């Protein structure tokens, strides 16, 4: 299962492998849990010619391409549907740390930035991994959207059994990210910035993306005719979807 609008490369990766993909409806808040539950509850293997779906691929934060961000309440609701139907969740979160300040309108005062690291961390929407009690979540993360786009370095977090299988697959597929990219990021994060420096960078990135988002939305408000166009100010990520 995937959102009805999703990252094209994710589809292009799994379809040649014979994976059957079904889409789940979305709204401005992302994937709709009721739509997912209805699909799974009424699944007819004979009519569909396929077994009941058992994996959900989702981009919860700053979704590509819609820009939608699932709220904490929605993530809990989707996780409960996954528990009900024994579905494994692949949580793709390259934009997780691009969560922005709330959009208050073109003529309103900006929301003050986080005062410290603790306030910044507290402001982040809980991930699926953080609410996982069954070991049914694999979280994908990346430095490509928040640090060095050309590094192509990321990491995965999940249960020991899943990670072991992931490692075995990597040994005969991609093997490892580029060694130069790994050492550059290691030197930056471990020897130069440290945890506090990285958090400072992420806070600065939030403010920068908030300014960019606000400029884009203001331009939409000023120049696009509301009779034929509509948009929602994204809470995270790189996309504004009409």
Question: Over which residues does each language-model region extend?
Answer:
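Acidic catalytic patch
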Residues: 43, 92, 181-185
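A structural signal for well-ordered alpha-helical segments within the folded catalytic domains
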Residues: 76, 160, 179-183, 210-214, ...
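Short coil/turn segments at secondary-structure boundaries
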Residues: 70, 102, 152-153, 169, ...
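Structured helix-beta-strand junction loops
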Residues: 84-85, 134, 169, 212, ...
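Conserved core segment of the aminotransferase class I/II
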Residues: 16, 20, 126-207
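Conserved core of the PLP fold type I
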Residues: 1-86, 90, 96-131, 209, ...
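Conserved glycine-rich beta-strand-loop-beta hairpin in the small C-terminal domain of fold type I
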Residues: 202-217, 221, 228-242
